[in-house]
A protein has these predicted regions:
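Non-catalytic regulatory/linker segments of enzymes
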Residues: 1-133
């Protein structure tokens, strides 16, 4: 990692310092991809969220994995903001895209056990409907 940019990031955020101390290996892997220099597309964010969680069936592991992913992305966004590598509109869009992706995967993860326990959600017209969050 670029030492000067890292110092700016750590001075800007105690949270970034904490995340680095816990998840340094992940952060170095993430940094190796693009040095946190490029914005993430909506598709990239959805892909990384889905791919990180797709093989997990245990709720505890799933929750831990999404929390780690959130911390990694937050570190990236703090880095980009502290080093003036991202504008406010792009940062806001990426945060929003991550929230949307997290809701989608959480809904998909929760649906199977809910259907097994309660059956498919059915509307007043007796047609199966999507689980609404």
């Amino acid at each position: 990692m670029n030492a000067e940019q890292l110092q700016k990031t750590l001075r800007a955020s105690q949270y970034a310092e904490q995340v680095l101390s816990i998840h340094q290996v992940y952060l170095e892997q993430d940094y190796a991809i693009d040095q946190f220099s490029q914005p993430l597309t909506t598709e990239q964010i959805f892909d990384v969220v889905q791919n990180s969680l797709k093989e997990i069936s245990d709720e505890t592991t799933w929750m831990r994995t999404i929390r780690i992913l959130r911390a990694r992305l937050m570190f990236r966004w703090i880095w980009q903001d502290a080093n003036q590598l991202i504008d406010v509109m792009t940062l806001t869009r990426e945060l929003s895209d991550f929230a949307d992706a997290a809701i989608c995967v959480a809904k998909a993860f929760a649906l199977a056990p809910l259907v097994a326990k309660h059956g498919q959600p059915v509307g007043y017209n007796h047609k199966i409907q999507d689980l609404i969050v």
